[in-house]
Amino acid sequence: MKLNELSPSVPKKNRKRIGRGNSSGWGKTAGKGSNGQNSRAGGGVKPYFEGGQMPIYRRVPKRGFSNAIFKKEYTVISLAFLNENFEDGEEVSLETLFNKCLIKKGRDGVKVLGNGELNKKLTVKVHKISKSAKAAVEAKGGTVELVEVKGFERAETNK
């Protein structure tokens, strides 16, 4: 078998060419009915248009506020996760987690939660840690260091 002998198992369906003469059955108005806004190119009203009455998005008042663009999203890891992936005496930081392909960068930092058990002495350098996780790390003789989240520094204004 050669490349030029290949053919699809199901033949390609020919597309319907509309507006190509009355004998095709799809000539003249090309399936768009008689005249009017919808028969024109780009015609028709927007999906949210309600015929001129006051639309729902303007009838309903605005409520609350959103702080979503300033929200910090942390990559959450557990003590059980650290126990599985790190050896005794190792350092846990954003760099070591990324180098071991355990997390993806692109979030605002790493947060450790106290789920599971920790049986190893670790040096933990993360952005946030829960009280129970901190207590568990220090109970095994490890240390906890909070690292600042790297962000944009504000430009000093000229006075």
UniProtKB/Swiss-Prot annotation:
Assigned keywords, A-Z: Ribonucleoprotein, Ribosomal protein, RNA-binding, rRNA-binding
InterPro entries: Ribosomal_uL15, Ribosomal_uL15/eL18, Ribosomal_uL15/eL18_sf, Ribosomal_uL15_bac-type, Ribosomal_uL15_CS
Region (Disordered): 1-46
Biased composition (Gly residues): 22-34
Database matches in HAMAP family: Ribosomal_uL15
Cellular component, GO, one term: cytosolic large ribosomal subunit
PANTHER family: 50S RIBOSOMAL PROTEIN L15 (PTHR12934), LARGE RIBOSOMAL SUBUNIT PROTEIN UL15M (PTHR12934:SF11)
Keyword Magnesium set for record: no
Example of a GO biological process term: translation
GO MF assignments: rRNA binding; structural constituent of ribosome
Subunit structure: Part of the 50S ribosomal subunit.
Function noted in UniProt: Binds to the 23S rRNA.
Family: Belongs to the universal ribosomal protein uL15 family.
Pfam families, alphabetized: Ribosomal_L27A (PF00828)
Protein's name according to its UniProt entry: Large ribosomal subunit protein uL15
